C-alpha cells in the first residue's frame, strides 16, 4: 500500500464557491481524504491537503484540476503570491513506507496525464525535475504567469509535458515530488512591509540565513499587517521554534514585536512536539497538552490539534 500526501495550490482565494467545488471534487473520490483546506484573499490562493493511497489521490487531483481549468482564468488573476497557473503547483509527498522515488514516479506519470488531457504545459520540479535548473520551484516560476507566457516558446523554457504555449485560461502547472514542507507565516505587529522583506532576506537560506528555509515579505490587507511568509523545507534541520525565535530577534532589532503566526495546511506531529520540548512542556503530558504548549509558544492563530497530520488522517479514516 503506497500512502501519499499531495498539497495542490490553486490560484483562487476570493471566491468561496470555486474553492468549495475544488474541495467537492476531491471528496467525490472514495479513499482520497481531504485533510485540510485554506483560503487566502490577499494571496488569492487556496491550498488543499489530500492523503490516501496513490490511486485515489491521483484521481482526486485530476478531478480538482478539471474544476480549476474550467473556473479560474489567469488572464484576470492577481494576488500577492507568485504563480504560473490556475493550478499553480502539485507536490507529491511520501507518507508511511512510500519513498521519494515512488513519488517521483507518481509525479511524472500524473504530469503527463494532465498535460495530455487538458493540453496544458507541465513543468517537473524538486525530486521529479528532469534538469538541474528546475529543482527549485522559484526557478520554474521565474517571471510568474506573465513572464512565462512571454518566454514559454524560447529555448530553456519549454515544458516537460504538453504544448510549448500556455493554456489560454489556466496557464501552466508545476508538478513535483518532495519531502514534507511546512508552510509557516509570521505576522509582524507592524505595517512596515519593507521590514518584513528585510527580515525575509536575512532569515532565508539563500541570503545566508536559516538552512532549508525560504522566505518572502508580504502585505496582508485584511489584517493590516506585514508578514514574513516562509517554507520550511526540512523541519528536522531548522525547527519551527528556531524560525520563530530568529524572526523575533530580527524584528526586535527594529523595535517591532511579533503579533502571531499561522500554519498553511498541516504539519507533522513531531514538528509540534519539538516546539513543546523547547518550550519546556513536560514530556509525559498528554499529546493535546503538548500541542497546546507549542501553539502558545508560537502564538499560532486559529490553531487546532487536527493540524497535526497524523491526528487528522487518523480522524478521517475513522469517519
Task: List each model region and its residues.
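Long, contiguous binding/interaction regions
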Residues: 1-319
Amino acid at each position: 500500500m503506497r500512502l501519499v500526501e499531495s498539497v495542490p495550490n490553486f490560484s483562487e482565494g476570493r471566491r468561496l464557491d470555486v474553492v468549495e467545488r475544488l474541495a467537492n471534487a476531491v471528496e467525490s473520490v472514495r479513499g482520497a481524504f481531504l485533510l485540510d483546506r485554506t483560503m487566502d484573499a490577499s494571496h488569492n490562493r487556496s491550498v488543499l491537503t489530500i492523503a490516501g493511497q496513490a490511486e485515489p489521490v491521483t484521481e482526486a487531483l485530476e478531478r480538482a484540476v478539471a474544476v480549476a481549468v474550467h473556473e479560474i482564468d489567469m488572464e484576470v488573476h492577481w494576488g500577492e503570491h507568485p504563480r504560473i497557473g490556475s493550478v499553480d503547483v502539485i507536490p507529491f509527498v511520501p507518507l508511511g513506507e512510500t519513498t521519494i522515488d515512488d513519488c517521483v514516479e507518481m509525479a511524472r506519470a500524473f504530469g503527463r496525464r494532465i498535460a495530455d488531457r487538458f493540453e496544458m504545459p507541465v513543468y517537473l520540479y524538486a525530486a521529479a525535475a528532469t534538469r538541474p535548473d528546475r529543482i527549485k520551484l522559484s526557478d520554474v516560476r521565474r517571471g510568474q504567469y506573465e513572464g512565462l507566457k512571454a518566454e514559454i516558446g524560447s529555448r530553456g523554457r519549454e515544458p516537460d509535458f504538453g504544448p510549448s504555449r500556455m493554456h489560454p485560461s489556466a496557464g501552466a502547472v508545476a508538478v513535483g515530488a518532495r519531502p514534507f514542507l511546512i508552510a509557516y507565516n509570521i505576522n509582524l505587529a507592524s505595517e512596515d512591509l519593507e521590514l518584513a522583506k528585510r527580515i525575509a532576506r536575512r532569515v532565508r537560506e539563500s541570503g545566508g540565513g536559516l538552512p532549508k528555509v525560504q522566505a518572502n515579505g508580504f502585505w496582508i490587507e485584511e489584517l493590516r499587517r506585514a508578514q514574513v511568509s516562509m517554507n520550511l523545507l526540512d523541519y528536522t534541520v531548522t525547527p519551527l521554534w528556531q524560525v520563530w525565535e530568529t524572526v523575533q530577534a530580527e524584528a526586535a532589532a527594529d523595535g517591532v514585536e511579533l503579533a502571531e503566526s499561522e500554519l498553511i495546511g498541516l504539519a507533522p506531529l513531531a514538528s509540534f512536539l519539538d516546539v513543546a520540548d523547547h518550550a519546556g512542556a513536560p514530556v509525559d503530558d498528554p499529546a493535546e497538552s503538548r500541542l497546546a504548549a507549542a501553539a502558545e509558544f508560537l502564538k499560532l492563530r486559529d490553531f487546532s490539534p487536527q493540524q497535526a497530520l497524523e491526528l487528522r488522517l487518523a480522524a478521517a479514516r475513522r469517519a
